[in-house]
């Protein structure tokens, strides 16, 4: 089996961190009991998906972005761990109140986007756009790293 260093040759530290955490999670999954029944295979698929998202959130800096905090919090909650939520109260600014008077089409699109981006529920539109751009960048990084892993590990 090829090493991760040979599979992912990059100068982007986020990719390296993602690859490290993702490969470590996959290794831990592999050490668990084999999954033979369809229910167990579905469980394994969910675990791999969760490992990919948690690795991506860690690579993004963990607590530096709202979406990464939301993903990590959701993962902790799924593991039945105690989750501490921020006690900070969010104020609705006058900008947000004014933004509610915008065209309904824009508001509907922003609301759909809030539902797609983890942790996007209470964000103002400008912050939502910033978080969405970073989230998309990290998702594309995740896809590229996973494609490198598949290309490097598949028989030629």
UniProtKB/Swiss-Prot annotation:
UniProt keyword annotation of Transmembrane present: no
Transmembrane segments: none
Primary localization: nucleus
Knockout mutant characteristics: No visible phenotype.
Domain of life: Eukaryota
InterPro entries listed in its UniProt record: bHLH_AtIBH1-like, HLH_DNA-bd_sf, IBH1-like
Domain bHLH: 90-139
GO biological process: brassinosteroid mediated signaling pathway; gibberellic acid mediated signaling pathway
Tissues with expression: Highly expressed in roots and at lower levels in rosette leaves, stems and cauline leaves.
Inducers of expression: Repressed by epibrassinolide.
GO MF term list: DNA-binding transcription factor activity; protein dimerization activity; transcription cis-regulatory region binding
Keywords annotated in UniProt: Brassinosteroid signaling pathway, Gibberellin signaling pathway, Growth regulation, Nucleus, Transcription, Transcription regulation
Keyword Nucleus: yes
GO cellular component, one term: nucleus
Subcellular location field: Nucleus
Entries under PANTHER family matching the protein: TRANSCRIPTION FACTOR IBH1, TRANSCRIPTION FACTOR IBH1-LIKE 1
Subunit structure: Interacts with PRE1, PRE3, PRE4, PRE5, HBI1, BHLH49, BHLH63, BHLH74, BHLH76 and BHLH77.
Function summary: Atypical and probable non DNA-binding bHLH transcription factor that acts as a transcriptional repressor that negatively regulates cell and organ elongation in response to gibberellin (GA) and brassinosteroid (BR) signaling. Is able to form heterodimer with BHLH49, thus inhibiting DNA binding of BHLH49, which is a transcriptional activator that regulates the expression of a subset of genes involved in cell expansion by binding to the G-box motif.
Extra remark: Plants over-expressing IBH1 are dwarf with round-shaped, dark-green leaves, short petioles, siliques and roots, and are insensitive to brassinosteroid. Plants silencing IBH1 exhibit increased length of hypocotyls and leaves.
Family: Belongs to the bHLH protein family.
Full protein name: Transcription factor IBH1
Biological source species: Arabidopsis thaliana
Encoding gene (name): IBH1
């Amino acid at each position: 089996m090829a090493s991760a260093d040979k599979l992912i040759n990059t100068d982007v530290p986020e990719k390296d961190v993602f690859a490290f955490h993702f490969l470590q999670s996959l290794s831990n999954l592999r050490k668990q009991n084999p999954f033979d029944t369809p229910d167990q295979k579905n469980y394994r698929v969910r675990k791999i998906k969760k490992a990919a998202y948690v690795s991506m959130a860690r690579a993004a800096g963990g607590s530096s972005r709202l979406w990464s905090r939301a993903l990590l919090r959701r993962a902790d909650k799924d593991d039945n761990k105690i989750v501490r939520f921020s006690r900070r109260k969010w104020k609705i600014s006058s900008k947000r109140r004014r933004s509610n008077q915008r065209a309904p089409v824009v508001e509907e699109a922003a609301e759909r986007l809030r539902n797609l981006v983890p942790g996007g529920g209470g964000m103002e539109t400008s912050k939502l756009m910033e978080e969405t751009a970073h989230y998309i960048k990290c998702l594309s990084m995740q896809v590229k790293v996973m494609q490198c892993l598949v290309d490097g590990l598949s028989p030629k």
